[in-house]
């Protein structure tokens, strides 16, 4: 029996959706353990595109899917995404979808605050999706969040709302924004309560019971480890922990329950929003990668910044997340290039270093040190075995493995789930 954590090792958009969908056939349960609806991914199943940003990927396969306590849940978006999937023919009932009773809710006031802050910042733009994720996590840490279970306790809900508004209305007065009426917020929550509560459960107990009888659990991370609130490119990060260890605290399981950590990495690098990006290519190569890779955000539609593979960053996240194997995606995007560069180190103030410093100033000053490899003209798209790959593509993969201290367990050669080469099965006992 094995339980697997899937974590992005870059800045998100690594192709986790396809890999999670591919692995979900081997799993009994799929769990989202952090983030909100700010990070989207697309699944391609039988030619149909499913765009998800909050609901676990396992739903498309009819697997028991859990939204863990580490996720912040926008109840209105939950209802909308549920309807969208159902309209596409996906059958979703409380029997296959559960939400942790102690998951915090994202409210309209969180979205307002997020947008007001982002538009009002002078100089420092974080590049948030303005969906209220950060403010919702602030209220969780500040012990004033409205949680899923509170929707069922209407006799105490108003008191919790008033406590929350004591904080938020003070902020709004300071920003010159109209205050929120407690009854209006109560009514807003009651509009969706009946659609949320049937899915509520004590999910840590459900996971423990499943573990005791040998169920296979797949823990699905959102975003990427380089957006982690502690280990990412702070302050250009998200508001939750995105490293693999968050699978434990974000779902209510112990570290011993995790048997394999699978890191996801693109064969090049992308980033959405602001922040340092040492290997970014603001040139024809960047345009080529963006167009060939269709690099536009699922949630925001924003154009992604593109650059060469950064082995320094991926190796750093492999170490921090305890990654045992890598799923390498979008190798086919590199088809046809005469040469391909890999960042193997940095220069910082005249010195060679092999890690990304935590200091924002140092991160902005590092200069990539590249090694250039010969490209390949043959197609890797839709390859189903190593024998189908050009020799130079295999050489590129092997060099990445050496640089990041992790072997490739899966290789994705197109968005279609069937175009996946399995080297090591993460669920193997």
UniProtKB/Swiss-Prot annotation:
The keyword Ligase applies. Pathway: Purine metabolism; AMP biosynthesis via de novo pathway; AMP from IMP: step 1/2. InterPro entries: Adenylosuccin_syn_GTP-bd, Adenylosuccin_syn_Lys_AS, Adenylosuccinate_synth_dom1, Adenylosuccinate_synth_dom2, Adenylosuccinate_synth_dom3, Adenylosuccinate_synthetase, P-loop_NTPase. Binds 1 Mg(2+) ion per subunit. Substrate binds at residues 298-304. It is found in: Cytoplasm. The keyword Nucleotide-binding applies. Pfam families: Adenylsucc_synt. One of its GO terms (molecular function) is magnesium ion binding. GTP binds at residues 12-18, 40-42, 304, 330-332, 412-414. Its cofactor is Mg(2+). Its EC number is 6.3.4.4. IMP binds at residues 13-16, 38-41, 129, 143, 223, 238, 302. Keywords: Cytoplasm, GTP-binding, Ligase, Magnesium, Metal-binding, Nucleotide-binding, Purine biosynthesis. Homodimer. Belongs to the adenylosuccinate synthetase family. Plays an important role in the de novo pathway of purine nucleotide biosynthesis. Catalyzes the first committed step in the biosynthesis of AMP from IMP. This is Adenylosuccinate synthetase. It comes from Bartonella quintana (strain Toulouse) (Rochalimaea quintana). The lineage of its organism: Bacteria, Pseudomonadati, Pseudomonadota, Alphaproteobacteria, Hyphomicrobiales.
């Amino acid at each position: 029996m094995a339980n697997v954590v899937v974590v992005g090792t870059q800045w998100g958009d690594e192709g986790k959706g396809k890999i999670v969908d591919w692995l979900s056939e081997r799993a009994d349960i799929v769990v989202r353990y952090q983030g909100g609806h700010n990070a989207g991914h697309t699944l391609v199943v039988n030619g149909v595109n499913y765009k998800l940003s909050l609901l676990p990927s396992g739903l498309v396969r009819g697997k028991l899917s859990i939204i863990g306590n580490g996720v912040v849940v926008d109840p209105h978006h939950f209802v909308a995404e549920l309807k969208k999937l159902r309209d596409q023919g996906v059958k979703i009932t409380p029997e296959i979808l559960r939400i942790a009773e102690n998951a915090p809710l994202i409210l309209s006031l969180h979205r307002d605050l997020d947008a007001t802050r982002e538009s009002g910042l002078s100089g420092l733009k974080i590049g948030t999706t303005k969906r209220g994720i950060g403010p919702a996590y602030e209220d969780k840490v500040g012990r004033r969040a409205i949680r899923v279970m509170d929707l069922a306790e209407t006799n105490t809900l108003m008191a919790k709302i008033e406590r929350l508004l004591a904080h938020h209305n003070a902020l709004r007065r300071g920003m010159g924004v109209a205050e929120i009426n407690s009854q209006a917020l109560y009514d807003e929550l009651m509009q969706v309560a009946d659609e949320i509560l049937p899915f509520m459960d004590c999910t840590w107990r459900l996971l423990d019971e499943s573990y005791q009888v040998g169920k296979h659990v797949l823990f699905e991370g959102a975003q990427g480890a380089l957006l982690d609130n502690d280990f990412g490119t702070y302050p250009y990060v998200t508001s939750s922990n995105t490293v693999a260890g968050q699978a434990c605290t974000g779902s209510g399981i112990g570290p011993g329950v995790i048997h394999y950590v699978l890191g996801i990495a693109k064969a090049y690098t992308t980033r959405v929003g602001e922040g340092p990006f040492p290997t970014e290519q603001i040139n024809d190569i960047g345009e080529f990668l963006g167009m060939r890779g269709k690099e536009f955000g699922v949630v925001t539609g924003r154009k992604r910044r593109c650059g060469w593979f950064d082995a320094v960053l991926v190796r750093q996240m492999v170490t921090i997340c305890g990654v045992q194997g890598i799923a390498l995606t979008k190798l086919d995007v590199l088809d046809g290039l005469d040469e391909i560069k890999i960042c193997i180190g940095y220069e910082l103030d005249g010195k060679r270093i092999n890690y990304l410093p935590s200091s924002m100033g140092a991160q902005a000053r590092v200069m990539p040190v590249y090694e250039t490899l010969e490209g390949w003209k043959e197609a890797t798209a839709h390859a189903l075995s190593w024998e189908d790959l050009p020799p130079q593509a295999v050489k590129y993969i092997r060099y990445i493995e050496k640089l990041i201290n992790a072997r490739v367990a899966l290789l994705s050669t197109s968005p279609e789930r069937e175009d996946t080469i399995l080297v090591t099965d993460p669920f193997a006992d």
